[in-house]
């Protein structure tokens, strides 16, 4: 059992090292897209399933409340957080539409959709991205593996932050770290002296 624990830590560290080399440009571009949207008076919608839903909610909470320093609230909505809306849509046998309907209702041109999917193939996330495209929103996609169907939907203004791993647990760990990086970059760009 102890060896298995060491393997988990070693894999996580190796994934972090690979991501630290491969992802800074994409993470920076994602943060810039979000900052520009916020400066223009827009908002960030975010969604995910399972652990990705937790990461989406963590991002929205960090925007609305704060990340590490006190600062004004920033507009972000976790589309997976409203159980009544989710179950109402799903109850009508529209499971794949649980996020897309919300994007169509709430999303506006200039908003950002933070779409989090470990494999990039979750149908409800794919549909949300398709809806965001029709609303002229920018997409920041957190993926893993080969990026899945999600990667093929992104345009030149969109950003894919693809974790260099084929292990779901490692990808999800790195998605949380990436969300924290995005929050840190947004805060330090919009409120550069708040952490002093």
Swiss-Prot record:
Domain SIS, residue spans: 34-196
Cystine connections: none
GO terms of molecular function: carbohydrate derivative binding
UniProt keyword annotations, A-Z: DNA replication
Subunit composition and interactions: Homotetramer; dimer of dimers.
NCBIfam families associated with the record: PRK10886.1
Function: Required for the timely initiation of chromosomal replication via direct interactions with the DnaA initiator protein.
Name of the molecule in the record: DnaA initiator-associating protein DiaA
Species this chain originates from: Pectobacterium carotovorum subsp. carotovorum (strain PC1)
This protein's encoding gene: diaA
